[in-house]
Each structure stands twice: as structure tokens, then as C-alpha cells.
Swiss-Prot record:
Subcellular location: Cytoplasm
Free-text comment on this protein's domains from its UniProt entry: A Gly-cisPro motif from one monomer fits into the active site of the other monomer to allow specific chiral rejection of L-amino acids.
Protein name: D-aminoacyl-tRNA deacylase
Listed EC numbers: 3.1.1.96
GO cellular component: cytoplasm
Keywords: Cytoplasm, Hydrolase, RNA-binding, tRNA-binding
Species name: Aquifex aeolicus (strain VF5)
Length: 148
């Protein structure tokens, strides 16, 4: 499971011109599910995201997590995080999980992160989405569950 995490001042996602998820200060999380991912990957990734100290204290040091600041989280599915561009010019997505299983794990990820008590919003799995992000920093971090 792979997540691209961006610290944001605000972020929202639209489908067919309608806002389906919107947050203020917190994290935008693009989530990709890889073949072979399990609930253990969800546990590790959620724990890392919730406790990652990427919010600054008064001295400008990364001291606080999204939990500490009681921030908000927008989770958007993105299978293209598993693009392979080694051959040719068209990316291959062979490493990405099949849609049915990917949706199941994505929903479990969202449920797990909601257990934090923070406001959590989402896009719509499998939909063509327009994502609007006001980066804060910018701070962008890529985390792969198999590397933590």
C-alpha cells in the first residue's frame, strides 16, 4: 500500500462538478493498493500517517502530528501510484490490485483512519475526480507500507 501525503491548508474533491469531500487544515492522502496488500499494511500505514510529525511548532520544527493539531484528512484512491514506466511510453499498472479487492482494502483503510476521531472525508473510489489542494509548505511525503 502506498500513500502520498500532503500537508494542506484546505483540500477538496469533486466528481461531475459536485464536491464529495472537503477538508481544512490537515492531510491530503492519495492511496494506492498493491497486489498482495493485507490488513497488516493498513494498520502500519494508518499508524504512520496519524503519528507523522509534519506540523510545525512555534520554532518552525516538525513537532506535531495530525492527531496533535486535531487536523482533518481527505483520502483519495489513486491506483496510478503503482505505475511502472520501465518499458515503453505507456505506464503499466500490473502491480496495482484488482478493483474489487482494492476497493475493499481502501474502505477498510478509511474506516481505520476514522477510528482516530478526526474528521475524515473521501473521494469516490474508481470515479474520475478533480482534486483541489492548497499545499502548506509544501510538505509532501511518500510512504510505502512494505518499507515501514
Amino acid at each position: 500500500m502506498r500513500a502520498v501525503i500532503q500537508r494542506v491548508k484546505k483540500s477538496w474533491v469533486e466528481v461531475d462538478g459536485k464536491v464529495v469531500g472537503s477538508i481544512n487544515e490537515g492531510l491530503n492522502v492519495f492511496l494506492g493498493v498493491r497486489k498482495g496488500d493485507t490488513e497488516e499494511d493498513i494498520e502500519k500505514l494508518v499508524n504512520k500517517i496519524l503519528n507523522l510529525r509534519i506540523f510545525e511548532d512555534e520554532r518552525g520544527k516538525f513537532q506535531y502530528s495530525v492527531l496533535d493539531i486535531k487536523g482533518e484528512i481527505l483520502v483519495v484512491s489513486q491506483f496510478t501510484l503503482y505505475a511502472n514506466v520501465k518499458k515503453g511510453r505507456r505506464p503499466s499498472f500490473e502491480e496495482a490490485e484488482e478493483p474489487k479487492r482494492a476497493k475493499e482494502l481502501y474502505e477498510k483503510f478509511v474506516d481505520k483512519i476514522k477510528e482516530s476521531g478526526l474528521k475524515v472525508e473521501t473521494g469516490i473510489f474508481g470515479a474520475m475526480m478533480d482534486v483541489f489542494i492548497e499545499n502548506w509548505g509544501p510538505v509532501t511525503i511518500i510512504i510505502d507500507s512494505r518499507e515501514i
